[in-house]
């Protein structure tokens, strides 16, 4: 989880992460722990949520981590969860390092616990490595 989110979605499952100062600082030691935890073959990849990884303050810390994941662990997938629509963050360099984005704000009136990988029906699962097609499930 990253800390810091300006969306403040009503009904958010993790509102404590809205605060940019919540939690522990991301250090070189934290990065080493993450890389080590991702190495086993039974670990498919890394999911980054929060807070919101697309907040500018979070992107600067995540870029080096995701570059390292791509270089050292090329078979692992990377999922980013953001309350922003993909169209509004499409220039983010994080997208070049991600495989899948789950986008859109959580909308409590569209909450559906039967959905895979997302909390409300308005959110999309977008396969960035597929043939340019967005998939929603």
Where are each of the predicted segments found?
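Canonical Radical SAM [4Fe-4S] cluster-binding loop centered on the CxxxCxxC motif
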Residues: 1-28
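Short loop/turn motifs at secondary-structure junctions
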Residues: 8, 42-44, 74, 97
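Canonical radical SAM enzyme core domain
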Residues: 19-33, 55-95, 100
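P-loop/Walker A phosphate-binding loop and immediately adjacent motor/lid segment at beta-alpha junctions
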Residues: 56-62, 67-70, 111-137
């Amino acid at each position: 989880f990253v800390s810091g989110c300006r969306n403040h979605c009503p009904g958010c499952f993790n509102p404590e992460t809205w605060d940019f100062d919540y939690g522990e600082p991301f250090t070189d030691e934290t990065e080493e722990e993450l890389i080590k935890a991702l190495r086993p073959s039974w670990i498919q990849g890394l999911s980054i949520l929060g807070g919101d990884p697309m907040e500018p303050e979070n992107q600067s810390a995540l870029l080096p981590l995701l570059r390292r994941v791509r270089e050292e662990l090329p078979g692992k997938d990377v999922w980013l969860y953001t309350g922003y629509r993909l169209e509004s963050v499409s220039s983010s360099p994080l997208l070049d390092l991600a495989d899948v984005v789950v986008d859109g704000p959580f909308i409590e009136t569209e909450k559906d616990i039967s959905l895979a990988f997302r909390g409300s029906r308005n959110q999309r699962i977008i396969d960035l490595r597929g043939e340019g097609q967005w998939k929603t499930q």
